[in-house]
Curated annotation (Swiss-Prot):
Modified residues (Phosphothreonine): T117
Phosphoserine: modified positions: S132
Entry keywords, A to Z: DNA-binding, Isopeptide bond, Metal-binding, Nucleus, Phosphoprotein, Repeat, Transcription, Transcription regulation, Ubl conjugation, Zinc, Zinc-finger
Modified-residue entries (Phosphotyrosine), positions: Y122
Protein name (record): Zinc finger protein 787
Region Disordered, residue ranges: 1-65
Assigned protein family: Belongs to the krueppel C2H2-type zinc-finger protein family.
Compositionally skewed regions (Pro residues) per UniProt: 39-65
Cross-link entry Glycyl lysine isopeptide (Lys-Gly) (interchain with G-Cter in SUMO2), positions: K191, K211
Keyword Phosphoprotein: yes
Biological function: May be involved in transcriptional regulation.
Lineage: superkingdom: Eukaryota
Gene3D superfamilies per UniProt: Classic Zinc Finger
């Protein structure tokens, strides 16, 4: 049998062989795109996102069938309308049984009664100090938190109380709303005017000074209610009782006569009883009181006591000479004058208090008592 050697020739390729033959490098068939690689194990398909279920429909506002005939404001209850109408009529049916002060709402009377009862239901969680009103507690808590929400738009300085910001802004505006009716000099603070009134003898009396200071404070708060004509200074006195007319600055006689009650013109047709005198004036805010006890209670509640120490408040300013503590820096500065010039002495002749100059008491007979310079000068003459 004869064997023939035949040359090999490639035959027809199947689909898999054709795929391998189409690549230059057979390894390329093992490299697949990331999109073609199936994930394993297969992930579970999440259901299509659906919109959240709608919430309950908003509750309709109750009807407000009670309408105020003065301003058109509507209310849902008759009691609310009645309470609102008192703002137009001025009715104050709720009277305090202790002092007779009246209020338009019973809730205001409840708050006022705490002045007489001494009730302090609001306590600070940090230091335990108690207050009669929640607003005072909120202001006190800013001491612990350091919050100062009232910021000056001119310099950026912040304050814990709005009244402190209003007092500070006068330094930028140069406004001096507290005017002396004797000489026309203006002051930015009522206590500065109170000190200035001592320079005018006709205005330094207790009753007259209190009237001038209180009228100046009211005029500064509501300047549109006061009128000025022909160079006169018109100062309102009381609630619509009249206007004290003081002549141009420098007219001391007219000022004294007007402040004494001479030359006042009434603005109302109905005569009213003259207000009780308030000779005790607070040097911090200008508020007047009929009794010294009322002034003392006011100073302790609003400005601290006479030495600047508030009840239950930790003093932050300590005197290095004697160790006495003060809450306010101004009180400490006033106290340091005692160490600088000594304690005030009382004149044995006229009873006035005065400070001795350095070395003044060396040549004076202590047994005869201390005397002021005016009394000693009168004897010399």
């Amino acid at each position: 049998m004869e064997l023939r050697e035949e040359a090999w020739s490639p035959g027809p390729l199947d689909s898999e062989d054709q795929q391998m033959a189409s690549h230059e490098n057979p390894v390329d068939i093992l490299i697949m795109d990331d999109d073609d690689v199936p994930s394993w194990p297969p992930t579970k398909l999440s259901p299509p996102q659906s919109a959240p279920p709608p919430g309950p429909p908003p509750r309709p506002r109750p009807p407000a069938p009670y309408i105020c005939t003065e301003c058109g404001k509507s209310f849902s209850h008759w009691s609310k309308l009645t309470r609102h109408q008192r703002t137009h009529t001025g009715e104050r049916p709720n009277a305090c049984t202790d002092c007779g002060k009246t209020f338009s709402q019973s809730s205001h009377l409840v708050q006022h009664r705490r002045i007489h009862t001494g009730e302090k239901p609001y306590a600070c969680s940090e230091c335990g100090k108690r207050f009669s009103w929640s607003s005072n507690l909120m202001q006190h808590q800013r001491i612990h938190t350091g919050e100062k929400p009232y910021t000056c738009p001119d310099c950026g300085r912040s304050f814990t109380q709005s009244k402190s910001l209003a007092k500070h802004r006068r330094s930028h505006s140069g406004l001096k709303p507290f005017v002396c009716p004797r000489c026309g000099r203006g002051f930015s603070q009522p206590k500065s005017l109170a000190r200035h009134l001592r320079l005018h003898p006709e205005l330094s009396g207790p009753g007259v000074a209190a009237k001038v200071l209180a009228a100046s404070v009211r005029r500064a708060k509501a300047p549109e209610e006061a009128t000025a004509a022909d160079g006169e200074i018109a100062i309102p006195v009381g609630d619509g009782e009249g206007i004290i007319v003081v002549g141009p600055p420098g007219d001391g006689a007219a000022a004294a006569a007007a402040l004494a009650g001479v030359g006042t013109r009434a603005t109302g047709t109905r005569s009213r009883r003259a207000p009780a005198p308030k000779p005790y004036v607070c040097m911090e805010c200008g508020k007047g009181f009929g009794h010294g006890a009322g002034l003392l209670a006011h100073q302790r509640a609003q400005h601290g006591d006479g030495l600047g120490v508030a009840v239950g408040e930790e003093p932050a300013h300590i005197c290095v000479e004697c160790g006495e503590g003060f809450v306010q820096g101004a009180a400490l500065r006033r106290h340091k004058k005692i160490h600088a010039v000594g304690a005030p002495s009382v004149c044995s002749s006229c009873g006035q208090s005065f400070y001795r100059a350095g070395g003044e008491d060396d040549g004076e007979d202590q047994s005869a008592g201390a005397r002021c310079a005016e009394c000693r000068g009168g004897e010399a003459r």
